[in-house]
């Protein structure tokens, strides 16, 4: 090994970057349980204090993927993940979860990777479970769902068993670490297209460049101004787009797409059951701000998936998927398929 954990810690304390092979070696020690909890905690805090670089995050993500239980999808046409880092503190209903069924209703193949709530009132796994989805699927069963239904959900604990070495340390620390931003970068189906929400504007450019380093085909990394890890109806959304190997950053606004603005707090929920009700209302065609924000995010998903030529045309397709009943049908078929395993 080119560096010891103690040397890596010292380097971070001095605000010096770890090289790719060094970060790779450190992450392998962490994920395998070979590094002591004290050193893991120290290194995580030192990395956070100096601010993790694009190279360090990319190396860490690659190691997490090495240790993950992968999902083998044969037909990868229009395969896309729609995911958020969480941690935005907005406590909204599960916008991206609703958007996945709308996008699937238009022909996207969704390989969604998510977990239970950490800081929100309802994580993607929580609301899917409330909707009747069986989370305890094997990797092969998830792959079959994606190929037959066009929708698959990879419950993070089922695919990242090595995280058991890190979870107790993260809980004890109680602060954000690099692991808060690694989850969305470690899709077990290796989807090359992604709509990713982040909890801080600084992460938009960083995560877009990490995705670039990881060889993604097309990605939108978004931060809703005012604090939302989705594309917002409350005002501008900062976007980092990776396309054709190039990253560019810009802002979009709901009015760009003919949508009315709505404050983020109008989407707040107290628990997964409340989130479930809004998701079902949207998929059943109830008009209003909740439907608008889902169509906005589904439209962006369809753009990234390569089905729509723009976010605007994606929104139009998303609205049709709802009014035709295709989006609700995707949910119902997905629930039945997961329960029949």
From Swiss-Prot:
GO BP, one annotated term: L-tryptophan biosynthetic process
Domain of life: Bacteria
Coiled coil feature spans: none
Cofactor: Mg(2+)
Residues where anthranilate 1 binds: 84, 115
Binding site residues for Mg(2+) 2: 229-230
Gene Ontology MF terms in the entry: anthranilate phosphoribosyltransferase activity; magnesium ion binding
Annotated residues for binding of Mg(2+) 1: 96, 230
Residues holding anthranilate 2: 170
Gene Ontology CC: cytosol
InterPro entries (alphabetical): Anthranilate_Pribosyl_Tfrase (IPR005940), Glycosyl_Trfase_fam3 (IPR000312), Glycosyl_Trfase_fam3_N_dom (IPR017459), Glycosyl_Trfase_fam3_N_dom_sf (IPR036320), Nuc_phospho_transferase (IPR035902)
Keywords: Amino-acid biosynthesis, Aromatic amino acid biosynthesis, Glycosyltransferase, Magnesium, Metal-binding, Transferase, Tryptophan biosynthesis
Enzyme type, top EC level: transferase
Cofactor note: Binds 2 magnesium ions per monomer.
Pathway participation: Amino-acid biosynthesis; L-tryptophan biosynthesis; L-tryptophan from chorismate: step 2/5
Residues that coordinate or bind 5-phospho-alpha-D-ribose 1-diphosphate: 84, 87-88, 92, 94-97, 112-120, 124
EC code: 2.4.2.18
Reaction catalyzed: N-(5-phospho-beta-D-ribosyl)anthranilate + diphosphate = 5-phospho-alpha-D-ribose 1-diphosphate + anthranilate
Function (record text): Catalyzes the transfer of the phosphoribosyl group of 5-phosphorylribose-1-pyrophosphate (PRPP) to anthranilate to yield N-(5'-phosphoribosyl)-anthranilate (PRA).
NCBIfam families, per database record: trpD (TIGR01245)
Family as reported in the entry's similarity comment: Belongs to the anthranilate phosphoribosyltransferase family.
Assembly, per entry: Homodimer.
Name of the featured protein: Anthranilate phosphoribosyltransferase
Organism ancestry: Bacteria, Pseudomonadati, Pseudomonadota, Betaproteobacteria, Burkholderiales
Gene of this entry: trpD
């Amino acid at each position: 090994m080119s560096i010891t954990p103690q040397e890596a810690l010292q380097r971070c304390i001095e605000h010096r970057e770890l090289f790719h092979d060094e970060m790779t070696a450190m992450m392998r020690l962490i994920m395998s349980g070979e590094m002591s909890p004290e050193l893991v905690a120290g290194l995580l805090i030192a990395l956070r204090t100096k601010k993790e670089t694009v190279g360090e995050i990319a190396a860490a993500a690659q190691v997490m993927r090495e240790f993950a239980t992968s999902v083998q999808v044969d037909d990868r046409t229009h395969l896309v993940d729609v995911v958020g880092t969480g941690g935005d503190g907005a406590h909204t209903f599960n916008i991206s979860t609703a958007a996945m069924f709308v996008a699937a209703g238009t022909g996207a193949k969704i390989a969604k990777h998510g977990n239970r709530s950490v800081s929100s009132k309802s994580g993607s796994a929580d609301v899917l479970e409330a909707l009747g989805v069986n989370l305890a699927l094997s990797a092969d069963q998830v792959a079959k769902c994606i190929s037959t239904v066009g929708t698959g959900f990879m419950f993070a604990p089922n695919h990242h068993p090595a995280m058991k070495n890190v979870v107790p340390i993260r809980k004890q620390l109680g602060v954000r670490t690099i692991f808060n931003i690694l989850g969305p970068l470690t899709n077990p189906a290796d989807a090359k297209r992604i709509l990713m929400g982040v909890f801080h504007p600084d992460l938009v450019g960083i995560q877009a460049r990490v995705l670039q380093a990881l060889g993604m085909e097309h990605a939108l990394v978004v931060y809703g101004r005012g604090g939302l890890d989705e594309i917002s109806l409350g005002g501008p959304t900062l976007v980092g787009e990776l396309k054709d190997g190039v990253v560019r950053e810009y802002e979009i606004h709901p009015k760009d797409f003919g949508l009315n603005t709505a404050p983020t707090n109008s989407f707040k929920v107290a628990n997964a059951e409340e989130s479930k009700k809004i998701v079902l209302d949207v998929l059943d065609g109830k008009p209003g701000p909740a439907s608008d924000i889902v169509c906005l995010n589904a439209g962006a998903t369809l753009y990234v998936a390569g089905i729509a030529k723009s976010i605007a045309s994606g929104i139009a397709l998303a609205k049709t998927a709802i009014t035709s009943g295709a989006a609700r049908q995707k949910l119902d078929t997905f629930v039945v398929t997961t329960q029949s395993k």
